[in-house]
Amino acid sequence: MNDTAPTQGVYLRFFVHENRRHGGMLLYDWLLAEAKKLGLSGGTAFRSIAGYGRHGVTHEAHFLELAGQETVRVDFVVTREAADKMLARVREENLPMFYAILPAEFGTLGGGK
């Protein structure tokens, strides 16, 4: 792999509850699968350790009674056009969820021998 010129794009983040489902799948898996279908080049799901949301409820992974209620963040570093396609897909399904879009510059570095 060789270096690529930096690309201007966005960091698209979705925040969902770990146990939330859509179409028979965990919602974070659904987001990753739909992004792949739309041609987004990659995505990653991260499980949170602790946090709180707009309702002020603290979620921590070590409380057994909150198992499955932790937040999963699903991230994509993509062009604005790709982010808009993904947001449109989520809107088509009428899925309520929080998201954030941040400006990003991205590319690839280096290569092997």
What are these model-predicted stretches?
Residues 1-113:
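Positively charged, small/polar-rich N-terminal and surface patches that mediate targeting and assembly
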